Amino acid sequence: DNPNHSR
């Protein structure tokens, strides 16, 4: 999971 991949 990448928590910094939110758009």
Swiss-Prot record:
This protein's record includes keyword Nucleotide-binding: yes
Record field: catalytic activity: choline + 2 O2 + H2O = glycine betaine + 2 H2O2 + H(+)
Pathway: Amine and polyamine biosynthesis; betaine biosynthesis via choline pathway; betaine from choline: step 1/1
Activity sensitivity to pH: Optimum pH is 8.0.
Molecular function, one GO term: choline:oxygen 1-oxidoreductase activity
Modification sites for Tele-8alpha-FAD histidine: 5
Cofactor: FAD
Keyword Flavoprotein part of the UniProt annotation: yes
Enzyme class, broadest EC rank: oxidoreductase
A single GO BP: glycine betaine biosynthetic process from choline
Free-text remark on how the cofactor is bound: Contains 1 FAD per subunit covalently linked to a His residue.
Keywords assigned: FAD, Flavoprotein, Nucleotide-binding, Oxidoreductase
Documented EC number(s): 1.1.3.17
Functional description taken from the UniProt entry: Oxidizes choline to betaine, probably via two successive reactions with betaine aldehyde as an intermediate. Accepts either choline or the reaction intermediate betaine-aldehyde as substrate. Glycine-betaine accumulates to high levels in the cytoplasm of cells to prevent dehydration and plasmolysis in adverse hyperosmotic environments.
Name of the protein described by the UniProt record: Choline oxidase
